[in-house]
A protein has these predicted regions:
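N-terminal leader/targeting signatures
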Residues: 7-13, 24
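Short, Lys/Arg-enriched N-terminal segments with co-localized hydrophobic residues
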Residues: 19-40
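Bacterial N-terminal signal peptides
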Residues: 52-62
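Beta-strand-enriched cores of mature, soluble protein domains
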Residues: 73-288
Length: 288
């Protein structure tokens, strides 16, 4: 008579980037624990077998037929827009080069103003989405990603329910989850451009005012393809803040003459899928 053995297999994934919960689950910026019982007939599992199961589940989930079909049904998307970014670092921000921030932490904000865009059949024209974050003390952006002090995303309150859901989804691509949890707020997001000065207001919480600086040979300095570049940061123009303030997440920032960046971009889901796959490989190679 066959004897039945059961083993409880516990899988724990620590992920650094929240990308797509169907296509690339390896890269979530959350910790998820899933438990199930495996029925083993007439025998026991060796340590090697247990390790093999864990690796197979960690690396192979995304290729299951059911999940592949679900991924194929995800809406395609495309966004043309402008990036406004500022942080507490001195210009240019060293964090994009895997270096330590200029101060103990990097207190940063980035806001995307969508000129034209869609998520599936949902138009995103004229909407905006932003993020405020803070890295841990004395650690680089790269080594600490996923364990930042906080991660707050602000969604344009002009968006209807469908647009809000779309912007929430896109925020996981534009702003990979930097902390263990993420807060969402729906607020007015506005921008004013007067001459060289760009001013962004994010509800009652954040204010960013900055301008481009002059390069030695004329025109603003351009940073191209830094080590941590992503599709909206493939290249950007370098500037300096006039003022960066933030009052939320138990913070009270007041910075002047710090890092400011500006860029125009045109991205879509295919560009991000390629980028996110490359980032997952880089993280794996780093042993993180």
């Amino acid at each position: 008579m066959e004897r039945e053995y059961y083993i409880e297999v516990r899988f724990r994934f620590s992920r650094l980037f929240n990308i797509d919960r169907v296509v690339r689950p390896i890269t979530f910026a959350i910790e998820m624990t899933q438990t199930r019982k495996e029925k083993i007939m007439k025998g026991t599992l060796s340590n090697t077998t247990v390790v093999s199961i864990a690796i197979a589940c960690a690396l192979g989930v995304s290729v299951l037929p059911g999940r592949a079909a679900e991924a194929a049904s995800k809406p395609s998307w495309k966004v043309t827009g402008e990036l406004e970014e500022a942080c507490s670092c001195r210009a240019a921000c060293p964090c994009w080069f895997k270096s330590l921030p200029s101060r103990m932490t990097c207190d940063g904000a980035q806001v995307i103003f969508i000129t034209k865009g869609h998520y599936g059949k949902t138009s995103l024209d004229g909407l905006a989405v932003g993020q405020f974050v803070q890295s841990p003390e004395h650690k680089s952006m790269f080594e600490s990603f996923g364990n930042w002090n906080f991660d707050y995303v602000y969604i344009d309150d002009k968006a209807n329910e469908e647009q809000r859901a779309a912007l929430k989804h896109l925020s996981d691509h534009f702003f990979p989850r930097a902390a263990k949890s993420r807060e969402f707020r729906f607020v007015p997001i506005n921008r004013k451009i007067e001459g060289a000065e760009h001013t962004c207001t994010i509800g009652e919480y954040g204010f960013v005012s900055g301008h481009l600086i002059e390069g030695g040979l004329g025109g603003p300095p351009k940073v191209v393809n830094p080590p941590l570049a992503d599709p909206t940061h493939k290249q950007f123009l370098q500037g300096q803040t006039t003022r960066l303030t933030y009052k939320d997440a138990a913070q009270d920032w007041k910075y002047e003459n710090s890092n400011y960046m500006y860029n125009k971009f045109d991205v879509d889901n295919k560009v991000y899928e390629k980028h996110e796959a490359a980032m997952a490989k880089m993280i794996k190679a780093q042993g993180m």
